[in-house]
Structures are given as structure tokens and as C-alpha cells.
Amino acid sequence: MHIYDKEFTQTELPMTKQEIRAVSIAKLMLKPNSILIDVGAGTGTIGIEAATYMPQGKVYAIEKEEKGLDTIKLNAEKFNKFR
């Protein structure tokens, strides 16, 4: 499922733009049960969009900035990808 930039909650942290997410996710060749580790997850856009292609998979988002963690949680909840 493609997610547009404007659909994500954004902060001053950098966000991977939708065109870059689309190419990156396509190159990962994810399977429905893949496991993705997103190091330096920022606002969580790559992991959250990737999760839409992995219904039985898992995404682990790692981010050192507290504001980033809060934003990842908001975005994950918004797209029902938080467990």
C-alpha cells in the first residue's frame, strides 16, 4: 500500500520522501513474512509503509531521538501497525 507523505505525522526530524520509500521498499523484495530492522528510523515512514506489504512479518524500528520514537508510535498507531 502506497502512503503519501502528507498522511504521516511529521516533525523537524527528516522523513524519507515517498518516491525514495517506493524504490527502497521495492528493492528489498519483501515477502509477507519478512522481518525488517529499520536502524535510524526517524519518523518511521519506511518501516510503516514496508509493514503494509508484510502482513505476517515484523518491523523493528530503532531510533535514538526521543521525539522520533514518539512520532514513530503516532504514525504506527495511525496506520494500525503498532504491536
Predicted features and spans:
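Conserved S-adenosyl-L-methionine
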Residues: 40
